[in-house]
Amino acid sequence: YEIGVRLVGSEMCIRDRGNGKSTLMKWIYNPSLVENYIEADGERIMGHERLGYLPQEMLDEDKEKTIYEYFSEEEIFWEKTPKELSVIAGKFGMKNDFFYSNQTMGSLSGGEKVKTQLMRLFIRDVSVLLLDEPSNDIDIATLTLLEKIINDWKHIVLFISHDETLIERTANMVIHIEQIIRKTKARYTVAKLPYRRYVEERLHKFEIQKQRALSDRREKKIRDEKYQRVMQSVQGALRSCTRQAPSVAKNLKDKMHTVKAMERRFEKEDENMTQMPEQEEAIFVKLGDENSHIPAGKTVIEYELSKLVTPDGKRILAEGIHLKIKGSEKICMIGANGAGKTTLLKKIAEELLNRNDIKAEYMPQTYEDLLDLDVTPVDYLDKTGDKEERTRIRTYLGSLKYTPDEMEHPIRELSGGQKAKVLLLRMSLSGANVLILDEPTRNFSPLSGPVIRKMLREFPGAVISISHDRKYIEEVCDKIYQLNPNGLQLIGD
């Protein structure tokens, strides 16, 4: 696609998954990062700006470094006074001696990784922040800090995000990149509007265009039916015309020329007919049915754990954990990064997946833990090998905006959002009445978010989840538990 944007003192948000957003951001930062796999025909006019880039994933080589080694790579780090470093540490809620720690970068929690990388950009005194999914894998406290950093930044912030709350509270301009017409055409929109106004205006324009397109098609149907009646009448008269009535035949032939001219005019009119609007957002399948409902009095799980320890068994994360879920309750566990939420959810999943009185399905935070990456989505979802079953699966995948080509490619080649859709479809097809979800919305675009939340809110069974998505917590969950060293505490009901 072609895109041209002038960045002048505005925060921005690039949205919708799988459309080259990260590639575009890398190209803006440093074209050499993407020259091996894309061809870019354009120019970067940077002026005197100093760019700072936060990648979506920390580089593997950086994970091996100690925190001290990571900061020491910046020459300007050695020019900073202890007071200046103390101010930077304070902004991020870190201790003054954090810069000199021998802890490896890879051992930091998700929130600590984001903070550390941002602190390095602050030390570098950059003027422009380029942030690729900065809200991934961070807790709510760090999200609040990130919002403050973006809002307090005096110059340009260009960020990619799926977090609707973060976007609503920070962005004052939107760059929307999408692929339409079965992903054969790229389209981008630049709107100098806050996110919520952009969504409302987009929906309003969509509805107006849709109504015009429907009106055009109704008028076309009436016109075409009338045209067919005239055409059939003239053709019938010509067939019944005898050689003894040449004047009548001539009149009918003249009429036929007129009818043909009408046809050509109609074809030109049809070329200018209002097109049905297209949006990239996927249409999601329904989760559960009447058999997924769980009686209010039924105990789904009563789980007790004296000690929750890290997977390597070296550290106690929490003690005295107790969780009781009844009926079709939908609960969410929150907590600081590294508190042990995913570890606890895995243990709960192990118990529920082995039960015979319920049908549980699990969506891990790392999809590769469950997906077979070497098979196609159709093969992964097909449990019978029946031709009708495979046709049904393809129909469902099509409703999720998969192209025929994507349906037959190995899962490892799909985007994170496409992998998540495979797991959601698996849950839909399985007839599950208990869903165990680790960050269920993390790989969906902001425009897909409301659809996902509605789908989970209307699911008739129980939901046990982890999330830092504030809209998901507010709209879907009945109860909110916070995991801390003293166990699970109910903080919202």
Predicted regions and their residues:
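ABC ATP-binding cassette signature C-motif
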Residues: 5-6, 10-209, 293-493
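Coupling and communication elements adjacent to P-loop NTPase active sites across diverse families
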Residues: 77-104, 111, 201-315
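Short, exposed "boundary/linker" segments that immediately precede the start
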Residues: 1-2
